[in-house]
A protein has these predicted regions:
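Extended, folded cores of ATP/NTP-driven motor/assembly subunits in large transport
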Residues: 1-421
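Hydrophobic anchor at the beta1->P-loop junction of P-loop NTPases
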Residues: 458
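Hydrophobic positions on the alpha1 helix immediately C-terminal to the Walker A/P-loop
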Residues: 469
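A short helix-turn-beta junction within AAA+ P-loop NTPase domains corresponding to the substrate/partner-engaging
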Residues: 502-506, 716-729
Length: 787
């Protein structure tokens, strides 16, 4: 064990905490018994090993949820079989306990995660409105409960020295078993285990847990003094008091001939504070088989006795009590399972701890839990004069003081599948709101930057809420983060929101006086190539759109354009002043000066965009493209110019991303009607390039489209799907549903969430997590009106 380093000096705050702990530690009842005396462990070490008794040592692993209830049947079967294998890992020398803690959190716990702090600017009223919306959504769900799951395992050993290596070996095996199931898990250290015990003992008051290992030596206190409640009261046989909370522990009597995998999930869906504890002890296989064989022998003996009686009484010897026949066949089936079907025997103690603020509420909570048990032909029975032992057995310590055990095989034990539905509620500073989990009613708050690939897609039929979802994310991102936002808006939908956020709407049309120069060059334009090479590549794409036709540019034409591009930037590169930036006309004039007839052909094709009626892109830039939120409105560009407009916007985005990269700032780029970009080979290739390279540059692109078929008809587009770890899928048309199911591996059950779904309802793909969501944004808000 590593010795704990002690501080030389304690701060004044530390001393205050220790004095408070000493005051609590000195509280005793008339018999001189303190609350600490009831807590059944001897010592907790900083690495998380706990000595429960002279020779029993335990460790605790916290594990996360996976989507079991949402999975299709074959996936459910795979999870169930994986869980059976997991249980079979435990031999009779390892006692283990599954603990499910649903504890009420203080309002501040969640309020801090969802509030958007005011910044004393023109947007504080919107921030306040958004925070209120989140608080209302939070109140609707059961996010008032913090739900955690633990596996505590323990072994007998003569000393901590002997226990430690063995516990570490078992810990590694358990973590690997969880990994095989796709479940995230981690081992708790000593302070984290104490924190969890403190949370159970202090349900009545949201006291912060304050403890440091180096407080123990100077104070003479034990770890129990920092976690014990103000008092325990076990006076009545059927319930107890812990501080100001009332509680009662019941055990589950399993009477049903067949168990259902929803039983545990239904307990955990209750909206009151609750702890479910399952103590499981594997029975030695040889002993289990011997016991069953002995039972079969006893049953056979009873059967013979009954047959003798029948012969003596003169009736048919085949008529024996039906119970005997049933028990006999069941015992033989059990023996067969143990001998040839990879089943083991387990002894299970299933405890449920309900708590409440008063006895009446406690009665209601227990009645609700009892109703769930009855629904599955089981019975929840209150422990009689064993409430103290029951409470201590519900702590994630790995100690079972209740000797009420039910023998079950592996598959019967595994039916209590500890997985229900995944949650996506991240506490990070930049976690944004994406709706409510349709399965659990909990808020979905995630930060796309934490994904391996933050690129995203928003997909849905017209009217399903695509643009609204994008606008909601833009508003949330603007109010909460310092990211820049760029929008390519082919339908002129985003202006009200952008203007309210004091952004810049750049309206590009043949009649507009807003100009963007496609020849603008940023000297930081590329990371590993010269800025000019990448700019040349862009201008080649632009010329290909203008000149190319079906065959695209010929090699000679490409060479001429590349030569002219390098010449046209000479003056600017020698003296990089804004007025030296070339425009399209400079390139046109250079092409006219070239000798090759191909150069004249390209120049003639460019003429309409330079001196003709489509010369909107032949001007120096005159708009503020440095605003934090920029929207390129290209609705009125017309068919001829729209493709070019989209390509120019993409080039502007690259410029912005490279500037922001140097400033360590993220850039979010939203492309509405994205399928339009993918119809042309040049814009499609450029878009795929963005999806491949943006992440390295701190860019987060989001494509918004209704035409999944168009999206997938492009040869390049599969790269976009492969490089998008975030997909926000709203209602889908029949044909599109099948394409997406194949592309993203969606089950039939999951597809039901995007089949004839309402506005703002669908499926969220976040990395490997799939969740159904609902987002009904309040309509009586300023934000709703501008979105």
């Amino acid at each position: 064990m590593q010795p704990v380093k002690t501080k030389k000096k304690l701060s004044r705050a530390d001393k205050k905490q220790i004095e408070a702990a000493i005051a609590r530690a000195n509280r005793t009842d008339k018999k001189g018994k303190s609350a600490q005396d009831s807590i059944p462990y001897e010592r907790m070490w900083p690495d998380g090993i706990c000595r429960i008794s002279d020779s029993h040592y335990t460790k605790t692993i916290q594990f996360q949820d996976i989507n079991y209830q949402l999975s299709q049947n074959e996936d459910k079967t795979a999870i169930f079989e994986g869980w059976c294998d997991f249980l079979n890992y435990f031999d009779s020398s390892i006692h283990f306990q599954l603990s499910f803690l649903n504890l009420a959190a203080s309002e501040e716990t969640f309020a801090n995660s969802i509030s958007i702090p005011p910044q004393r600017d023109a947007f504080d009223s919107i921030r306040e409105e958004y925070t209120t919306m989140l608080q209302n959504q939070l109140a609707r769900g059961n996010n008032g409960l913090i739900k955690t799951k633990y596996l505590t395992f323990g072994i007998d050993a003569d000393s901590i020295k002997a226990a430690k290596p063995r516990l570490e070996r078992i810990e590694t095996d358990i973590l690997n078993n969880f990994k095989r199931l796709g479940v995230a898990a981690r081992t708790l250290d000593g302070k984290e285990r104490l924190f969890q015990l403190h949370a159970v003992f202090h349900m009545d008051e949201q006291l912060p847990f304050q403890f440091e290992w180096d407080w123990l030596a100077p104070s003479g206190l034990s770890t129990k003094d920092f976690i014990a409640p103000s008092s325990f009261e076990f006076r009545t046989g059927k319930q107890f008091r812990m501080g100001k909370k009332y509680g009662a522990v019941s055990f589950l009597q399993i009477l049903a001939p067949e168990l259902n995998d929803r039983l545990l999930a239904d307990f955990l869906d209750m909206e009151s504070s609750l702890i479910v504890s399952m103590h499981i002890q594997s029975v030695d296989q040889v002993k289990a088989i011997k016991t069953v064989k002995r039972k079969i022998t006893d049953l056979d003996r009873s059967k013979i006795e009954e047959q003798k009686k029948a012969v003596r009484a003169g009736y048919d010897m085949d008529i024996i009590p039906s119970d005997l026949a049933t028990y006999g066949s069941e015992a033989k089936k059990l023996l067969q399972d143990l001998q040839s079907r990879n089943e083991r025997m387990f002894l299970l103690t299933f405890l449920v701890l309900n708590t409440a603020d008063n006895p009446r509420q406690l009665g209601n909570n227990i009645f609700q839990a009892g109703s769930i048990a009855q629904k599955y032909n089981c019975q929840l029975t209150r422990l009689d004069f064993q409430q103290e032992e029951g409470l201590m057995s519900c702590l994630p310590l790995g100690l079972n003081q209740i000797e009420i055990q039910r023998g079950l095989t592996t598959s019967s034990t595994a039916i209590f599948v500890p997985f229900t539905t995944q949650e996506l509620f991240q506490n990070g500073k930049e976690a944004l709101y994406y709706g409510i989990n349709a399965l659990s009613n909990n808020l979905i708050m995630v930060d796309r930057k934490l994904l391996k690939n933050p690129n995203g897609l928003i997909l849905g039929t017209p009217g399903s809420g695509k643009s609204f979802s994008a606008k909601r994310e833009i508003a949330n991102c603007f109010l909460l983060t310092s990211d820049d936002v760029i929008i390519c808006d082919p339908e002129a939908e985003y202006a009200p929101l952008v203007e309210r956020l004091h952004g810049q709407v750049i309206k590009i049309s043949p009649t507009s006086t807003n100009y963007i120069n496609p020849m603008d060059l940023n000297l930081d334009y590329s990371d590993d190539e010269s800025p000019l090479s990448l700019k040349s590549d862009f201008i080649l794409s632009l010329c290909e759109l203008i000149v190319g036709g079906k065959e695209g540019l010929q090699p000679v034409q490409k060479t001429i354009i590349d030569r002219c591009v390098r010449l046209v930037y000479n003056e600017y590169l020698n003296d990089p002043k804004p007025e030296n930036m070339p425009i399209l006309e400079d390139l046109y004039n250079l092409l006219r000066e070239q000798e090759e007839k191909e150069a004249q052909y390209i120049a003639t094709a460019l003429e309409i965009y330079v001196t003709g009626s489509l010369n909107v892109f032949n001007h120096q830039s005159n708009v503020d493209i440095d605003n934090r939120i920029v929207c390129y409105d290209i609705k009125e560009l017309g068919k001829q110019l729209k493709k070019i407009g989209m390509l120019v916007v993409q080039d502007q985005v690259w410029n912005r991303v490279t500037i922001n990269r140097a400033a360590h700032k993220s850039t979010r780029y939203y492309i509405d009607e994205m399928h339009l970009l993918l119809k042309e080979e040049q814009t499609a290739a450029y878009t795929v390039e963005i999806w491949k390279r943006f992440r390295k540059w701190g860019g987060i692109p989001t494509g918004i489209t209704q035409n999944v078929k168009d999206l997938l008809s492009s040869r390049e587009v599969e790269n976009i799907f492969e490089n998008s770890d975030f997909v926000y899928m709203l209602n889908q048309a029949g044909g599109d549903r099948q394409i997406l199911a194949k592309q993203l591996g969606i089950s039939t059950h999951q597809l039901s969430y995007v089949t004839h779904s309402g506005e703002g309802e669908g499926l969220l793909f976040y990395g490997s997590t799939i969740l159904p969501f609902v987002d009904h944004f309040p309509k009586n808000t300023e934000l709703y009106r501008i979105m």
